[in-house]
Amino acid sequence: MLQKAETAYATFKSDHKYRDRDGRDIIFGTDHVPNYHGVVYIELVKIPAILYSYTGKKEYLQEAQNGIAKMEKYDMLASGIPSSNEHFNGISEMAGHETCNLATLPYTYGYMLQVTGDATWADKIEKAVFNGGIGAVTKDFRAEQYFSAPNQFIATLNSNHLGYQNARMAFLPGHDTECCTGNVNRFMPYYIQQMWLETKNGGVAASLYGSSEINAVVGAGKVPVKIVETTKYPFEEAIAFEVQTQKTVKFPFRLRIPAWCANATVTVNGKKVDGKVIPGEFFELNRVFANGDKITLLIPMDVKVTSWPNNGVGIERGPIVYSYPIASTADTVSGDYKKATKAFPGFELTPAHDWNYSLLVNNSNDVEVVKNSNYTYPWKVGANPVRLKVPAQKLKDWKLNSYVDTASKATIYQTSPFPANRETTGDKEYIELVPYGSTLLRVTVFPKQ
């Protein structure tokens, strides 16, 4: 069976010259720039990694790694999801992504995490889920966008600027084709699936963080244990674990140290653990654990200012990308849109106040972190655990794109690119950015002054 799989993959690659553009995308080991259907590419690029896991042939793993690296180089957006309005579409402030990719990326990257043991794959999974994933749905999870984007200033039945069907950026329970409606339900289960992993040496690895419990059999004696994880991650920095076991047992317990965290610390029963805690790697506690042992991982979240094409700028803190939330007027989609119901309504959102800000930010010193401990559901719009206060100025010429539809004679409004003229209007003011995932309309990549 394995030989057949290798033969099939070799054939899969070898006849690409006789295929269309989609076929040329599958030559993952070359410098060919991916330019076809993003969902298919992300699904297929894990195949050589799976073959590596069964054969040990490093050339398979290298093909998968190269295929992903070039996709990220040319298409990865601030949301943690590659641009892909059906086809890959490059990096710009106008780029967006198909919601199917919110599921396929953590699925494929989960395989890469398991096959390689490289902690940075988990970093990428959490960024995609917490930002691009949750940012594409209403916070009650009853409506989603077919296309979503880091910058989306309007979301109506005719505002889609990414091509194909006009309504694909509206928040609806179903779209013109149902692939995204099915796939949107997968991204969070895939996150949960990768939270806890078994290690080859009889231990466990906490790879993606969130309050949870795991029952495992560990150590040379295959002793059953329960580990209880308690945290408010990704909004707070402390992650606590308690080991519950009927008898003492020695086993390796691995903790992911995110690549963005420079000063993580690990304590056991209140005492700091010696050893190098390296960003982007797993830290291993290989010791005898007793019932009630408490492990605490502290991962400080620093502010990071990111650069984007066309002199764009974004801001992150830990795994969370921050956006300016655009207050909106929500109109319920009328009953003649048959996929919207009373239980699962659809919405058109139009901006209700100004959003045309440029940022006056050079580095993290220009950003103030504002914490709020009084919250319940952290993704609720307007009730955020962490906000970032930043200096900004409005741009005179940054407005919604508009055109007159020749058939209906109606004026159509769409999200717009950065203006060529960055003349400001008004004085410097301070605006508050919130987690990307808690927004519906937003600005995530800003023009920089």
Q: Where are these predicted regions, by residue range?
A:
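Well-ordered alpha-helical segments within folded domains of soluble proteins
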Residues: M1, N35-S53, H97-L113, T181-Y191
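Catalytic cores of extracellular degradative/oxidative enzymes
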Residues: M1-N35, V39, A49, K58-E59
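Structural helix-adjacent loops and short alpha-helical linkers that scaffold large soluble proteins
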Residues: M1-T7, Y52-Q65, E72, L113-D123, ...
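Long, well-ordered core segments of solenoidal/helical folds
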Residues: Q3-G23, E63-G80, K127-T138, S212
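Carbohydrate-binding/catalytic loop surfaces
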Residues: R21-L44, S79-T104, F141-H175
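C-terminal beta-rich recognition modules with glycine/proline-rich loops and embedded aromatic residues
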Residues: A64, D123-N131, A136-I239, I278, ...
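Beta-strand-rich binding/interaction modules
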Residues: T248-V268
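Solvent-exposed beta-strand/loop surfaces of large extracellular or lumenal domains
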Residues: C261-R287, V305-N310
